[in-house]
Amino acid sequence: MTKILTVTFLVLTLFILTLFPAYPQGQADFRVMSYNVENLFDTDDDPLTADNDFLPDGNRHWTGGRLYHKLQQLAKVITAAGEWSTPAVVGLCEVENDSVLVRLLRSTPLRGQHYRYCMTHGEDTRGINVAFLYQRDKFRYAGHAEHPVRFTRKSHKRTRNILHVWGEVMTGERLDVFVCHFPSRYGGEKESEAGRADAARTLRLLCDSVHALCPSPHILVIGDFNDTPDNASMRDILHARPLPAVRSSVPGSMPVRFPPDTDLSLLLYNLFAGGRHNPPGSHKYQGEWSQLDQIIISSSLADTTSSMHLVPGSARTFSPPFLLVRDKSWRGERPFRTYYGFKYEGGYSDHLPVIADFRLSVGP
């Protein structure tokens, strides 16, 4: 039965991809962006989730005007992050539902960028999901699925599902993307780490399942992991390690030496592991920066001889001046948030986005 389902899946994917015209030849850049957009809710009550704070008469007085302003702000960030052109694909965290995504893509300057989207519809108690935006001329969508995190201790616990999207890039190769928002640190980092370990374990199984179908897959993992690259969930369970120095995209990273018998095709590389960053993180809490938002790639995308590969030095936290404000409680700057506690600031998000570039060689 498993073999039949696998063959059927591959045949359907190939059929969908044949419906699209061929890409133009030459070289092309492919920018990836990941952004936790801080509570992108609509103004309607969902009786199945705890969204009462984000209603016109809720604690945060979330109105249609504030929603419209936030959508314009997010469109500005996505456009600016693309620099010369908007990112080819964008992963979003903390999105309530389809309604806000449709408005983002139709009621802002993004409406001319030909984005389409898919998203999860999970059972998170807060009612937030993850989403994936893609430009149709740069990514040929073939399908998507969402996967719940398998908790080992609290089987009844609910969090954001992991979104798996697959399709074809301009080289004609398949790209598998996972968009994640791991369980939060609410209640304490140590007290909550088991949930993130379970999420990392689920994600690793999903990556391994893709590898079982393809010996050298192009895998891209993006999102807010609520852990840093050095935490056990990322380093020891997901096994996402720093890039070897010869392929490193992070200035100052240390060389990584693998045992001779290591199967490099199974490795995942965290583009934000090791090295020095400016700013020193994507999220700031009580004066401390943490790199909670990350981009992780399979070894095939780190190989500069591949027809799709990482542009060395391109992975970074996107931090233009308009996304930052002076931190009055602590030193330096912090992200310009929509809310600071229950106080409305009218900013963008409590996270900064992360981006990375890939080079595509489109042959005849």
Regions found by a protein language model. Give the residues of each.
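Structured beta-strand-rich core segments of catalytic domains in phosphoester-bond hydrolases
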Residues: 37, 95-183
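Metal-dependent phosphoester-hydrolase catalytic domains
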Residues: 208-219, 227-364
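Bacterial Sec-dependent N-terminal signal peptides
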Residues: 1-27
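Extracytoplasmic/secreted cell-surface and envelope-processing proteins
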Residues: 42-43, 99-102, 126-129, 186-189, ...
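Second-shell loop/turn segments in exported
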Residues: 58-65, 86-93, 119-120, 151-152, ...
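N-terminal, active-site-proximal structural segment of metallo-dependent hydrolase catalytic domains
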Residues: 23-114, 118-130, 200, 328-332, ...
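Metal-dependent phosphoester/phosphodiester hydrolase catalytic core
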Residues: 48, 159, 169-201, 205, ...
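Structural recognition of the beta-strand scaffold that forms the well-ordered cores
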Residues: 31-34, 88-93, 116-118, 131-134, ...
